[in-house]
């Protein structure tokens, strides 16, 4: 039996294949809680407008809370005609409280109803993802605090560039995820615009005070000012999908670093067994699958953004059924990212760092810039100093020695002012300590930033 919210003008039942194509309850059932929250607020607005009496209002609220409880405890039983979450809730509500349920949809369209549901849902997932990102930042911060003095190669073009500290590397990703959190919080401000009361597209003619709805739904702090835009706007979904995709890109970059650093060729870190897998053929293998999946799943997050934007790009005002396609990309991105962030935080918290392998990867050529800086201190223009050091690097390569072991005569042949003091430059810890500008890799600056982030993440957000 069908329980459609429409159909009076139709003389034929919906074809079975059309129902399968059209119905969305199988995926939009996760909107049950926010749908019921919106319906309770709507019932309050109906009561205030005198469209239902106190007894009907009480029955609606009681029945809706019973339906909410059924969804929460897993006892809700779908019916064959449950086209979507709105139909399912109203059908079950009528079974529980009788014909009073028939008044709930007075003056309301599924267009403004689902727009409200989606805004409530996206607010909730944005906050959830913000919490997950904080957990990841804390895992990175703990590693940074342990390794403020741990030296490692820093890379550009995946080539050894200059020495840095592993703590500084961890802090870089904390900053990256901080921007993601800022974007989430900023997006929430645009989600908190209430479309309820806009009707199908033109507004409400039954005396509903929309201002009252913002009091009943305290997640919203302003009303949508144009009913046409209110029911057709899905910018907020596109925005959070983009933010999810960008978080995924940042996770992918983090994962790529860890995959490299965990390889035998680097050996800088080792992932815990709990976040690695093996090979069905090669007994010796320990694969960084947690990181590879983070890297791989970033692609589906990007795909979900494109999916929604493609749906929206050609839609005329106002609501169109195409908009039903906003939900699965959103739900998929949230599910993927919510679990991925948990895995990332746990994998980082439990990984083992090998400072000795990091130190062994350092080489004197990484201090070539320090040598150029020394020439600058002697009054030589940097571009000239750069060229002289390039000559010294080439000469060391020709002789098959490191810069540290290049004879003084070779140094003086390129720059006569150099003396034996030049060899003091070849001290990795000294080099790193000199990078003491704000935001630099010097251990004192890394410790300073660790304290800053500890205050932000633990004390300010406790």
UniProtKB/Swiss-Prot annotation:
Keyword Lyase among UniProt keywords: yes
UniProt cross-references to CDD domains, sorted A to Z: Argininosuccinate_lyase (cd01359)
GO biological process, alphabetically ordered: arginine biosynthetic process via ornithine; L-arginine biosynthetic process
Classification via PROSITE patterns: FUMARATE_LYASES (PS00163)
Matches recorded under InterPro entries: Arg_succ_lyase_C (IPR029419), Argininosuccinate_lyase (IPR009049), Fumarase/histidase_N (IPR024083), Fumarate_lyase_CS (IPR020557), Fumarate_lyase_fam (IPR000362), Fumarate_lyase_N (IPR022761), L-Aspartase-like (IPR008948)
GO cellular component assignments: cytosol
Keywords: Amino-acid biosynthesis, Arginine biosynthesis, Cytoplasm, Lyase
Primary localization class, coarse: cytoplasm
MF (Gene Ontology): argininosuccinate lyase activity
Glycoprotein among keywords: no
Pathway: Amino-acid biosynthesis; L-arginine biosynthesis; L-arginine from L-ornithine and carbamoyl phosphate: step 3/3
Localization, UniProt: Cytoplasm
Family: Belongs to the lyase 1 family. Argininosuccinate lyase subfamily.
Protein name stated in the entry: Argininosuccinate lyase
Organism for this UniProt entry: Chloroflexus aggregans (strain MD-66 / DSM 9485)
């Amino acid at each position: 039996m069908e329980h459609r919210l429409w159909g009076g003008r139709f003389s034929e039942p919906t074809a079975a294949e059309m129902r399968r194509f059209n119905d969305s309850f199988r995926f939009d059932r996760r909107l049950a809680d926010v749908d019921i929250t919106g319906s309770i607020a709507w019932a309050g607005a109906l009561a205030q407008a005198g469209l239902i009496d106190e007894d009907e209002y009480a029955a609606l609220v009681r029945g809706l809370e019973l339906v909410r409880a059924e969804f929460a405890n897993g006892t809700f039983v779908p019916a064959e005609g449950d086209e979507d979450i709105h139909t399912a809730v109203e059908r079950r509500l009528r079974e529980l409280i009788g014909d009073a349920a028939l008044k709930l949809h007075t003056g309301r369209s599924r267009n403004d109803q689902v727009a409200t549901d989606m805004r409530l849902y996206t607010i909730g997932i944005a906050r959830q993802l913000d919490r997950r990102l904080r957990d990841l930042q804390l895992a990175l911060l703990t590693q940074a605090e342990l390794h403020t003095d741990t030296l490692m190669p820093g890379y550009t073009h995946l080539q050894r560039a200059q020495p840095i500290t592993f703590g500084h590397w961890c802090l870089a990703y904390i900053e990256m995820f901080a921007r993601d959190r800022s974007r989430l919080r900023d997006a929430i401000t645009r989600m908190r615009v209430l479309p309820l009361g806009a009707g199908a597209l033109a507004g409400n003619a039954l005396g509903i005070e929309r201002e009252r709805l913002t009091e009943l739904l305290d997640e919203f702090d302003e009303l949508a000012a144009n009913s046409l835009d209110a029911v057709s706007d899905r910018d907020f979904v596109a925005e959070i999908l983009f933010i999810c995709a960008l978080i995924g890109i940042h996770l992918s970059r983090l994962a790529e670093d860890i995959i490299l650093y965990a390889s035998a060729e680097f050996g800088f870190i080792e992932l815990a067994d709990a976040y690695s897998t093996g090979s069905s053929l090669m007994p010796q293998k320990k694969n960084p699958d947690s990181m590879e999946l983070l890297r791989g799943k970033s692609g589906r997050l990007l795909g979900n953004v494109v999916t929604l934007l493609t749906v929206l790009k050609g839609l005329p005002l106002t609501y169109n059924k195409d908009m039903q396609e906003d939900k699965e990309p959103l739900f998929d991105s949230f599910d993927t990212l919510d679990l991925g962030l948990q895995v990332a935080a746990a994998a980082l918290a439990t990984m083992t760092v090998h400072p000795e392998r990091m130190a062994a990867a350092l080489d004197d050529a990484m201090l070539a810039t320090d040598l150029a800086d020394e020439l600058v201190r002697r009054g030589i223009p940097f571009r000239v100093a750069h060229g002289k050091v390039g000559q010294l690097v080439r000469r060391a390569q020709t002789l098959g020695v490191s810069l540290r072991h290049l004879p003084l005569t070779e140094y003086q042949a390129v720059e006569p002012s150099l003396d034996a003091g030049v060899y003091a430059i070849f001290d990795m810890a000294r080099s790193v300590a000199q990078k003491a500008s704000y935001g630099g890799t010097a251990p004192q600056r890394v410790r300073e930033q660790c304290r800053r982030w500890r205050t932000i993440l633990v004390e300010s957000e406790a």
